[in-house]
């Protein structure tokens, strides 16, 4: 593969997509992704198991006991079908004000629900790296997220922390030093770190290039960062305007050309 050595399905692996009707699983889109990955020897990261958005509509109407069963059945079904999944975003955006899964909080009332969900993932996905994923992790909400996830980390069920990196430039441009300091602080918790959803929302080529050159080397060279995922790459096909790095005809934007040259030079060291 010219550009990538890891795949993260953006929507195809979310619970509400796969199990829109309880007990009926639609694996068609995911099967294609895993087949492609296996043929090309590319690891897959699952995204995501438990989130307050894009969950099946039927889950909120169940009793707590049935919600617990449904969550476990979903996790078990996924990892039974795709046991070679290398990494999993187990819980996504659980900080209050983000998108915490109310159904999971209800299912495990009286306990730390994040820890309980990770325990289920550990039980059924023993060979996968289990990750907590959230936005504003490197910026405004670092302390809140660390406080939220610490019990699960202390319980030994979290392997990595995923830092969505969509908004490093608006409404404030975070300097390279500020991002390094944040990585140091988060890394002190002891888990692996992942830049999980990196994009640069800039239609101006020079602006996108400048931001890429500012932050990517900080990610790449930090000892705790084990991987970087770009959140979409084809212009006009990404979730936010201006984040694409390659035109549909294959022409690279300057930020992509710089990135490829940077990685080539780094690997030659």
PLM feature spans:
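Aromatic-rich peripheral "rim/lid" segments of glycoside hydrolase catalytic domains that contact
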Residues: 19, 57-60, 77, 81, ...
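Short glycine-rich, flexible loops that bind phosphorylated cofactors or substrates
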Residues: 15-16, 170, 237
